[in-house]
Amino acid sequence: MNNKMNIPLSGIIPPLVTPLLDDDVLDVEGLQRLIEHLIAGGVHALFVLGTTGESQSLSYKLRVEMIKNTCRIAKGRLPVLVCISDTSIVESVNLACLAADHGADAVVSAPPYYFATGQPELIEFYEHLLPQLPLPLFLYNMPTHTKVNFAPATIQRIAENPGVIGFKDSSANTVYFQSVMYAMKDNPDFSMLVGPEELMAESVLLGAHGGVNGGANMFPELYVSLYNAAKNADMEELRRLQEKVMQISATIYTVGQHGSSYLKGLKCALSLLGICSDYVAAPFHKFEQRERGKIWKALQNLGVDVVLR
């Protein structure tokens, strides 16, 4: 493990979008602008190839390019976490080894997501995976996509391996997340991270270490400031910033009637901000001009002066 990653990992760790020019063409210049934008905004680490990064819609070639270019651009300035979730344990290990070769600091794994797994099978899966990994591992709970929740006792069992250093929860279930925090209370070096940005501040107030929040792609300073307000229990500032986060959630992520609205809105906003392309991997499509106008209006209402292009 590189010395630059503090344990437990804390703060705002944006799940990077994967900037695309076509289904199998990485927008490398856009990725450069995005990473510099995030570093300038004070984020604490980078997380690539997660759900926001459209990993499961990308070819292995493109995933490899994303890993290589992210590590090259970051240049060790902050930790890089790489998601290796896959239906094939062999491919997960291959991605982990490539991530290590290019200087990443940790890997992240959700359960294999095609066949539904039980808790004993989850334990066996990670007992098989962990000895093959060259980097520390974060467990990733995404039950809407994987059809299974990590039971708190399962996390305890898997985390008996010292190579498991944290947990990212995207269930949006605060009772569940608190149950996991309670189960892991005797392991202070185990990083507890929450995915939904709407829940980040309250989670940090109650002891979580930070958030893996998609909106930080657009406004890293906002999410870092909200994290700091929660960390310092500055309730007045927290309420003010939380309102901004909820405004983003209620406007930029809700254009359209489909589950892809979050991703399309986020990428459209990044395009309007001049950061990267708004191309979305198949089977989805980027917003048409009418929806783009709604995102432009949402940015204007947030006080961001951008030109509608």
Name these PLM-found stretches:
Residues 2-149:
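Active-site beta->alpha loop and helix N-cap motifs at the rims of alpha/beta catalytic domains
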Residues 26, 201-309:
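Structured C-terminal cap/extension of enzyme domains
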Residues 31, 63, 67, 92, ...:
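A general structural signal for well-ordered alpha-helical segments in protein cores
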Residues 41, 65, 69-73, 98, ...:
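Alpha-helical structural signal in soluble globular domains
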Residues 82-85, 140, 170, 193-194, ...:
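Active-site-adjacent beta-strand anchor residues
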Residues 131-132, 145-249:
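Catalytic alpha/beta core domains of metabolic enzymes, predominantly
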